[in-house]
Swiss-Prot record:
SUPFAM superfamilies: Ribonuclease H-like (SSF53098). It comes from Geobacillus stearothermophilus (Bacillus stearothermophilus). Keywords: DNA recombination, DNA-binding, Transposable element, Transposition. InterPro entries: RNaseH-like_sf (IPR012337), Transpos_IS4 (IPR047952), Transposase_11 (IPR002559). This is Probable transposase for insertion sequence element IS5377. NCBIfam families: transpos_IS4_1. It comes from the Bacteria. It holds the Pfam family DDE_Tnp_1. GO terms for molecular function: DNA binding; transposase activity.
Length: 377
């Protein structure tokens, strides 16, 4: 394998040793190991995601083929347990901040969207006794604020699998963006509070919510529109009713189901509101993608640090791949889907135009941000 076509190599060019050291110091971790360093643990988990290794032992067997030093599997297992996972989480945030400077798609919405959802990773209950889930399973949950404009996660909160989505969602709000959420995050009091806090939102309503004093909004009818009705009302029963009047848009999805969403956006068309909510598919695709292609369901360790270090590293791998794809795509006229790019990148079989485009994209990044990016691809 060409040593210049690995995720660790790309990350090393984007994030300096000094930046990693600053993160480690910020969480109070001192890396005293000479045989297997913090940087090497990060590279191990990136390679494990990239090549879907099955365990620490598997990684120890094949790691030297990918540029890692020779080590016993117990060495990396101990390191993963020892390193605070907040380091990997902060590293993810740093890489996201670097990668989203140049990558943005225009979705023609009034403000950027912030899609919030969660995904759960489960194993046998004896593997993670600190994270009980249901029945014979244990599990951890990653709550994600996802940006469709950047095709990247923006924020991540980790919890055990039984933690409800609603309360955690409070940590993922952002008044500069439109919050897009499913029914799990719906709560009448929360909507009233969002109006007072000027937090824009498009949230799917629960099916049993009573609609009080409906007043239709004027709109141009269109036979091609999926919107069924557009009105304002108060939400809930007399015992628990919203103090604010909210806008409700009911539209029909591709499967013929009526979807009811509530919003405080009054200067956007009902069709735009429906389009905003349907951007939720992007975070669901993201979750499926990392689980299928970045080894997320295969947890190597049993401690919080080991588990979350691996999961945050998988997210880092996705961010690096997505950024590299988007930047290279700008440099070439040859069409290639994201998944096709990833498969060919992993196998070292990218078309020549894409290799040239990658080199040009990395050189451009180096010129802008002063990082040396030669010998890649």
């Amino acid at each position: 394998m060409n040593k210049h076509t690995t995720l660790p190599n790309l990350m090393q060019k984007l994030v300096s040793d000094e930046e990693i050291q600053l993160i480690a110091e910020a969480v109070g971790y001192r890396d005293s190991s000479r045989t297997f360093t913090l940087r090497e643990l990060i590279h191990f988990f990136l390679l494990a995601a990239m090549h879907q290794w099955k365990s620490f032992r598997h990684g120890a067997d094949v790691g030297p083929l990918y540029g890692l030093p020779r080590f016993h599997y117990s060495t990396v297992s101990k390191k993963a347990k020892e390193v605070p996972y907040d380091i990997m989480k902060r590293l993810l945030a740093l890489i996201i901040s670097k990668c989203n400077r140049q990558t943005r798609r225009s979705l023609r919405f009034p403000k950027p969207l912030r899609v919030v959802d969660s995904t759960t990773v489960t194993v046998g209950k004896n593997r993670l006794p600190w994270a009980p889930y249901h029945g014979e399973r244990a599990g951890v949950k990653l709550h994600v604020a996802y940006s469709p404009e950047f095709s990247l996660p923006a924020d991540v909160v980790e919890t055990t699998g039984l933690r409800h989505d609603g309360p955690v969602g409070e940590q993922l709000t952002n008044a500069q963006q439109v919050l897009v959420e499913d029914r799990a995050y719906f709560k009448i009091e929360r909507l009233d509070r969002f109006v007072e806090q000027h937090q824009l939102f498009v949230i799917r309503m629960k099916d049993n919510i009573e609609l009080h004093q409906k007043k239709s909004l004027n709109r141009l009818s269109s036979t091609s529109s999926s919107v069924q009705t557009d009105f304002t009302c108060q939400l809930g029963t007399k015992q628990c009713r919203s103090t604010k009047r909210h806008r409700v848009v009911i539209f029909r999805d591709a499967n013929g189901r009526d979807i009811r969403v509530v919003t405080n956006l009054f200067h956007a068309s009902a069709e735009t509101i429906a389009d905003m909510y349907q951007q939720r598919w992007a975070v669901e695709v993201f979750f499926r993608w990392v689980k299928q292609y970045l080894n997320v369901p295969t947890l190597f360790g049993t401690t919080e640090n080991a588990v979350y270090n691996q999961l945050f590293a998988a997210f880092i791998a996705y961010v690096l791949l997505r950024w590299l794809y988007d930047q290279t795509k700008k440099q070439t006229n040859v069409s290639l889907s994201f998944i096709s790019f990833v498969r060919r990148f992993f196998s070292g079989q990218l078309p020549l135009d894409w290799k040239s485009g990658m080199a040009a994209a990395l050189f451009e990044y180096a010129q802008i941000y002063g990082r040396r990016m030669y010998n890649f691809g």
